[in-house]
């Protein structure tokens, strides 16, 4: 799934952040390292019109993927302003909240991070489980979805 593009109003949550994007990413990486994640990688693609940033990591041989949303703050008389700092803080706070539940033994790591579990999409590229479920929610709701037919053979 491609990165989500969101337009927010001035004054919306997180628009007052003073933490830049790179600092948020470093803090997320530190949280993941504290939880013994491995192969942590940041993939930035600034070649196109829209900058995309993806965080990839593993824990207990399970791959995870987090795509940072592309957030623009609406402006009246000027072009909308790219706010990756807001994107970074939102993802930072979400990961922090999930890992607090892990620290308190409410969830184990794989439960807490299940939304970000990387599974192959129809082309074989990694996709977050939350996005995969969203794309297939009609089939899931109707009871016609069978993940065994969606995965490459031998991956069940």
Descriptions of predicted regions:
Residues 1, 26, 31, 46, ...:
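Detector for methionine-enriched segments
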Residues 1-27:
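Terminal, regulation- and interaction-focused segments at domain boundaries
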Residues 20-73:
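Compact, well-ordered interaction domains used in eukaryotic information-processing assemblies
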Residues 67, 72-156:
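Intrinsically disordered, low-complexity regulatory regions enriched in serine/threonine/proline
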């Amino acid at each position: 799934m491609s990165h989500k593009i969101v337009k927010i109003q001035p004054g919306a949550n997180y628009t007052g952040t003073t933490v830049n994007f790179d600092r948020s990413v470093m803090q997320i990486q530190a949280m993941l390292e504290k939880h013994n994640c491995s192969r942590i990688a940041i993939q930035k693609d600034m070649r196109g019109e829209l900058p995309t940033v993806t965080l990839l990591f593993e824990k207990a041989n399970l791959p995870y993927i987090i795509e940072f949303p592309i957030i623009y703050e609406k402006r009246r008389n000027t072009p909308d302003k790219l706010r990756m700092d807001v994107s970074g803080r939102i993802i930072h706070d979400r990961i922090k909240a999930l890992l607090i539940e892990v620290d308190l033994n409410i969830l184990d790591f794989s439960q807490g991070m299940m939304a970000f579990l990387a599974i192959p999409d129809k082309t074989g590229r990694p996709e977050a489980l939350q996005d995969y479920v969203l794309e297939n929610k009609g089939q899931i709701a109707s009871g016609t979805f069978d993940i065994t037919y969606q995965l490459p053979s031998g991956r069940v």
